[in-house]
């Protein structure tokens, strides 16, 4: 089966949905979407190259998880037995690792285990938020609704991360160009200039001399530089996996100039969106806080949530518990307080998440617009300095010839 990216309107909610569907052809994809209650607006064949690494590495992507969740929700909502629904979804997935996991889940379900317990055995595919929502769906008898909420939350999270990665793409390309320009000048042009002046027995300007020494260093010890980078990168990666390294990395994200606002809003949106989904499906407040502390994926924010959870356990309101936490933006406890007064905490957390998601979109666009000219100026300075270092001795040589 082929994978198709689609954009469709949900007939029930009238909302636009973007996701992935697996089918033999575009027409088959359209029919499948229509059967699931969607009005297809756009269907495009997915480039196989984008899934090449995922298929052969055994990695389960967000798209794999979203497709699985949406299809399972549709089948369960249509009244199919759980095991049969799982088998149908298993047949449609192209990810080998996902097929293996679903087969194990089918065996567990047929053996009498609950679906949530079966999912919990595979944390690499289904995190604690996923398991909690499925468990809530089992308790309330609204499994299909819980799965649809899960898919929607995962799509929002994936879209947000995609925008952040997209914003960093242009700066990465420009930095790569800068490195290539420097490498070309150091290893191609500079040695020729050095040879010319060595033959003429002429002195070199300081900038040119520094460039030549740099080029000679990298030419003779390039292997040492590469080895040092590999070893340094390995030890840095290992350090960042330690408890101290994780804390340093997460603290850095929350305080790094220019980007700290984006990171904080991203974590607030993640906390609020996850909390909204959990509470709306009947997950108790304390369980919601415990699960979101894992879901935010930042140890500093996680500790803030757990401290607030302890205060809530002692009888304090959630809004008051979060109001004194340094890294929680002020709007979060304010909106939660309104929710506490109206009895609609989940709705207010959803609105809070939407506000931060919208602000994050604007900041990402603004950052991209701001970074472009800064990088171009930096590139011009680097290239200009290197060109000047090469031309200065040439002008000096021409001047000496004219004087004579």
Feature-to-residue mapping (PLM):
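Membrane interface segments of multi-pass transport proteins and intramembrane proteases
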Residues: 195-206, 217, 243-261
């Amino acid at each position: 089966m082929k994978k198709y990216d689609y954009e469709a309107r949900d007939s029930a909610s009238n909302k636009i949905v973007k996701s992935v569907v697996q089918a033999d052809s575009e027409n088959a994809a359209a029919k499948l979407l229509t059967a699931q209650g969607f009005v297809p607006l756009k269907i495009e064949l997915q480039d196989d190259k984008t899934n090449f690494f995922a298929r052969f590495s055994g990695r389960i992507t967000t798209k794999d998880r979203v497709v699985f969740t949406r299809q399972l929700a549709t089948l369960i909502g249509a009244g199919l037995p759980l095991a049969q629904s799982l088998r149908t979804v298993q047949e449609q997935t192209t990810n080998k690792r996902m097929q293996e996991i679903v087969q194990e889940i089918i065996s567990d379900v047929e053996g009498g285990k609950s679906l949530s317990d079966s999912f919990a055995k595979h944390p690499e595919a289904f995190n604690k938020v996923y398991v909690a929502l499925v468990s809530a769906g089992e308790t309330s008898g609204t499994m299909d609704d819980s799965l649809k909420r899960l898919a929607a939350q995962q799509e929002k999270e994936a879209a947000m991360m995609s925008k952040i990665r997209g914003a960093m793409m242009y700066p990465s390309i420009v930095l790569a160009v800068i490195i290539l320009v420097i490498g070309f000048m150091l290893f191609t042009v500079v040695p020729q200039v050095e040879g010319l002046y060595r033959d003429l027995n002429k002195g070199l300007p300081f900038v040119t001399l520094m460039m030549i020494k740099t080029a000679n260093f990298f030419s003779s010890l390039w292997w040492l530089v590469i080895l040092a980078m590999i070893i340094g990168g390995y030890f840095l990666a290992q350090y960042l996996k330690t408890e101290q390294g994780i804390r340093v990395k997460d603290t850095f994200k929350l305080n790094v100039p220019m980007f700290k606002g984006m990171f904080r809003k991203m974590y607030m949106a993640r906390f609020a969106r996850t909390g909204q989904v959990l509470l709306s499906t009947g997950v108790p407040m304390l369980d919601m806080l415990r699960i979101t502390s894992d879901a935010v994926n930042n140890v500093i924010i996680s500790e803030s949530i757990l401290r607030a959870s302890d205060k809530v356990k002692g009888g304090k309101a959630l809004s008051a518990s979060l109001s004194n936490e340094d890294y929680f933006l002020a709007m979060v406890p304010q909106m939660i307080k309104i929710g506490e007064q109206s009895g609609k905490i989940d709705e207010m957390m959803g609105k809070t998440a939407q506000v931060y998601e919208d602000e994050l979109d604007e900041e990402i666009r603004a950052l991209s617009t701001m970074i472009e000219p800064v990088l171009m100026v930096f590139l011009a300075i680097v290239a200009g300095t290197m060109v000047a270092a090469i031309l200065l001795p040439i002008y000096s040589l021409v001047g000496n010839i004219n004087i004579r």
